[in-house]
């Protein structure tokens, strides 16, 4: 076994170049290959509760080992020949071409791919690490804390909390914001029960498992919004324990916004005083969009919430995953501890934190400002309505929640089509998330491709699935609900 590994790692440069030549025309590590897809696994979506055969099969993504790029040892004379450098440059050039092509057909995930951070290229030569508390400088001097705190202050103003009353940090992703917010709630109420709607992001239930929390999954309305009648029943059944709630400011699949005011009212009517509940608002995508919609309800610390998190790589358009988590200063004491090694305090989830992300966020917040984001939000909502209307005109069931840019429609029958357009699917539905980088032209290309393929999928006379149970009868235009 060891011998085979060594032989793999000592491939001659001639062999590498030969392989590169073979790949030169169609090198695409992310393309859908013609080889059979991996075997399906059952995920239970749509399962028959009576034990019948109603389970839906989920197709996993292909094994990346089929397209992995080997790491090989440089040859002794490589510094003179430069073959290895030329090989790597060619691979990277082709990979860049792949990224350009894949970006053209990106629709299903909430990432804004329209950005230009060329001005920050000069800072990529530094190992910038914001370990520890953002507000206290550590012994490690290569950091970007002034930029990070500037970004945090901007979000504090957005969510209406005074500088001296909040604590927060720039996270490595949206999930970390949820993990931190729920952890603060758990530390405040060690015996508290976590309540989250069934359509909450999977990271919320991951947090419950990690922290060994009792968790109640609350039913949702057709829109995907939390059902406060079901929440009331579950709260009344557990009145003896504090409540820790996850409130969705945009659910993952349907883009539904939980009614924060109704959630608070339900808690109060069930006898939970403000010192017996903690609310974390998962605003991964819409937490930054809603403040710029005039008719949208406010997410604000003027209400009895404990924390808000938002992703930085989604609507903002940061090129690396990151996020912002803000909580009340009075709450963070339950997590904070002194770290002599850093000469600082720490209440974050991670140790080392990406010091480049604050630079990108600071740069784009300064360039766009409130007015710039407002224009982009209006564009996204307008284009989302355009897509929904065109789908309905084409005879395709579609739903768009108010305040949302997530358009839900019937799941395409062909997994290759799903992968080509990078659609997110669940059960019989798929969705497109309209971001600032999604243009009318891109939507028209998608619609044209979808309509063309549907003619093929249903040419045998079969009918598209009824989506009434997923999107409601008003949005379903299957033969039974036209």
From Swiss-Prot:
A single MF term (Gene Ontology): pyridoxal phosphate binding
Tissue: Expressed in roots, leaves, flowers and siliques.
Domain of life: Eukaryota
EC number: 4.1.1.-
GO annotations of cellular component type: cytosol; plasma membrane
Reaction(s) catalysed (UniProt annotation): L-serine + H(+) = ethanolamine + CO2
Induction: By nickel and manganese ions.
Keyword terms of this UniProt record: Cytoplasm, Decarboxylase, Lyase, Pyridoxal phosphate
Gene null: resulting phenotype: Dwarf plants with necrosis along the edges of the leaves, multiple inflorescences and sterile flowers.
Subcellular location field: Cytoplasm, Cytosol
Protein activity control: No inhibition by ethanolamine, choline or their phosphoesters.
Entry binding sites for substrate: 201
Subunit-level organization: Homotetramer.
Note: The mutant phenotype can be rescue by exogenous application of ethanolamine.
Function: Catalyzes the biosynthesis of ethanolamine from serine. Highly specific for L-serine and does not attack D-serine, L-phosphoserine, phosphatidylserine, L-histidine L-glutamate L-tyrosine or L-tryptophan. Decarboxylation of free serine is the major source of ethanolamine production in plants and ethanolamine metabolism is crucial for the synthesis of choline, phosphatidylethanolamine (PE) and phosphatidylcholine (PC), and thus for plant growth.
Similarity remark: Belongs to the group II decarboxylase family.
NCBIfam families listed in its UniProt record: PRK02769.1
Protein name: Serine decarboxylase
Underlying gene: SDC
């Amino acid at each position: 076994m060891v011998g085979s590994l060594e032989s793999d790692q000592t491939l001659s440069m001639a062999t590498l170049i030969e392989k590169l030549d073979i790949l030169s025309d169609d090198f695409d590590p992310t393309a859908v290959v013609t080889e059979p897809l991996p075997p399906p696994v059952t995920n239970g979506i749509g399962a028959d509760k009576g034990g019948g055969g109603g389970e839906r099969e989920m197709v996993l993504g292909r094994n990346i080992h089929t397209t992995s790029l080997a790491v090989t040892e440089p040859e002794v004379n490589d510094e003179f020949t430069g073959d290895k450098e030329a090989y790597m440059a060619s691979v990277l050039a082709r990979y860049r071409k792949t990224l350009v092509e894949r970006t053209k057909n990106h629709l299903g995930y909430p990432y804004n791919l329209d950005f230009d951070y060329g001005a920050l290229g000069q800072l990529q030569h530094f190992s910038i690490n914001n370990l520890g508390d953002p507000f206290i400088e550590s012994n490690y001097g290569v950091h970007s804390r002034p930029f990070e705190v500037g970004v945090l202050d901007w979000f504090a103003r957005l969510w209406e909390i005074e500088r001296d009353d909040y604590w927060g940090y720039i996270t490595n992703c949206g999930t970390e914001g949820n993990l931190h917010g729920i952890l603060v709630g758990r530390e405040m109420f060690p015996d508290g029960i976590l309540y989250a709607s069934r359509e909450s992001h999977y990271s919320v239930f991951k947090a419950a498992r990690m922290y060994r929390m009792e968790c109640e999954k609350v039913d949702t309305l057709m829109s995907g919004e939390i059902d406060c009648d079901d929440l009331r029943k579950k709260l009344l059944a557990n009145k003896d324990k504090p409540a820790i709630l996850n409130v969705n400011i945009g659910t993952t699949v349907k883009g539904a916004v939980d009614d924060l005011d109704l959630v608070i009212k339900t808690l109060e009517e069930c006898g939970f005083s403000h010192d017996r509940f903690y609310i974390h608002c998962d605003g991964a995508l819409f937490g930054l969009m809603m403040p710029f919609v005039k008719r949208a309800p406010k997410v604000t610390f003027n209400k009895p919430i404990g924390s808000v998190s938002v992703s930085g790589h989604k609507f903002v358009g940061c090129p690396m995953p990151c996020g912002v988590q803000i909580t009340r200063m009075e709450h963070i004491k339950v997590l904070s501890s002194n770290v002599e090694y850093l000469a600082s305090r720490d209440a974050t989830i991670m140790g080392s934190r990406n010091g480049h992300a604050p630079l990108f966020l600071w740069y784009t917040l300064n360039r766009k400002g409130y007015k710039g984001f407002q224009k982009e939000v209006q564009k996204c909502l307008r284009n989302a309505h355009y897509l929904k209307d065109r789908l309905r005109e084409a005879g395709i069931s579609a739903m768009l929640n108010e305040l949302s840019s997530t358009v839900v429609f019937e799941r395409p029958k062909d997994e290759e089509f799903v992968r080509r357009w990078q659609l997110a699917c669940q059960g019989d539905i798929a969705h497109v998330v309209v971001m600032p980088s999604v243009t009318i032209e891109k939507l028209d290309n998608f619609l044209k491709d979808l309509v063309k393929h549907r003619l093929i999928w249903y040419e045998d006379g079969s009918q598209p699935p009824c989506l009434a149970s997923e999107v409601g009868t008003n949005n379903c235009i299957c033969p039974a609900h036209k």
